[in-house]
Amino acid sequence: TGTDEHGQKIETKAEEAGMTPQAFVDRIVEGERGVLDLWKLMNISNDRFIRTTDDYHCEAVQKIFKKMYENGDIYKGAYKGKYCTPCESFWTESQLVDGKCPDCGREVHDAEEEAYFFRLSKYADRVQHLLEDTDFLQPRIRVNEMVNNFIKPGLEDLCVSRTSFSWGIPVDFDPGHVVYVWVDALFN
């Protein structure tokens, strides 16, 4: 367990607080009444507390990201669509609910930027097999929903880097790109 400390909303909130993003997340985690204090108060323990700003985590993410690129699972393209900053999520027009983010209901804004994408479409058959032929997804009633809503219409490749802000793990082979926060946290 640990904390997910990168992304546009962290960068924005740190700027609003007159702090660097690192100082901002340090205060949230280590400061008085921060995450670590709250865990002690609630008697929560863990084997290892991982912060996504830890050097070893950043190095591991960069290594995995580069390997995925070298294997052809990541390619450079351009993202154009709607973006919800609080959710740190990209959306297509058809996914919006009354023109707003389907997750949080907040306003979205137009976004266009160079980005790297993960070839999720390459793995559609494997994902479908995993869903339909194993007990991977629980409850099982969700299998049809996933297959019909995501697999059959065609899995879209996923945006895995950002260029419109800098608070994140740098893509070491392409300056100006940072690893998208949700990918960064997945490798935790």
For each predicted feature, which ranges?
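N-terminal Rossmann-like or analogous alpha/beta NTP/dinucleotide-binding catalytic cores
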Residues: T1-I74, E88, H129
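The −1 position to Zn-ligating cysteines in a subset of zinc-ribbon hairpins
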Residues: K67, Y83, F90, K100, ...
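Structured secondary-structure scaffolds
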Residues: T1, Y56-A60, P86, C104, ...
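Cys/His-rich microdomains that often coordinate metals
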Residues: W91, E107-V108
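Short metal-coordination and nucleic-acid-contact micro-motifs, chiefly zinc-binding Cys/His arrays
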Residues: K80, V97-D98
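Short, surface-exposed recognition loops or helix-turn segments adjacent to catalytic cores
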Residues: A78-Y83, N144
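Short linker/helix segments within small regulatory modules
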Residues: T92-V97, F173
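A short alpha-helix-loop-beta-strand transition element characteristic
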Residues: D73-A78, V108-H109
